[in-house]
Amino acid sequence: IPYREFLLETVPYFVEQVEAYENGDDYDKSKVGLIQTPQSFYNADIFQFNLFSESTLPNEQDFFSKEINVCNNSHGAAVYTGSNTLIFRKAIEDVGGFPTDTITEDFELGVRMNAAGYVNYSTKSPMASGLTPTDLKSVIKQRARWGRGVIRSSYNMNIFFNPKLTK
C-alpha cells in the first residue's frame, strides 16, 4: 500500500525526460528507467516474530533494500524487486514489455532496462508497505521461487557475458 508521499518522492526523477519525450526531443536513454523504494512491512518477519524482537531487530529485508540496493545507485543498476516502484513506461516499451518466461519478471525487467541504457535507482526511504511471510514454509517457498527465477533470468539475459551489462 503506497504512502501518501509516494508520487511526490518518485515522480521528480522522471520530469526532465518525460518533457523531452513529449516535446519530440531526442531524450537521453541513459536516464531513469525506474525508481525502487525499499521493501517495508506492516508485520514482523519470521525472525523478528520468533525471537520476540520486533522493536530491536530490523526486518531481514532492510539490509538489502536500504543499504545494498542504494549502493547499486553508484552504477545505475538498482535491483527492481517488484513492488514499491515507479517505472518509466517508455523504458518498458523499449525493452519489449514485461518478460513472461520467468517467475521473477521484476528482476529481469530491471536488467533488460540496464542493458538498454536506462539507469535504475533505489531510495532509502520506504514509500509503501506490504506483508511479509509469517511461517517457515512460506518463507522457504518464496526464497526458492526467487532463486529459481533469478537463475532463469540470468540464463535468459546471458547476464555474466552480456557486454551491455558491463562498464
Where are these regions (language model features)?
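Long helical/loop segments within the catalytic core of UDP-sugar-dependent glycosyltransferases
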Residues: 4-103, 136-166
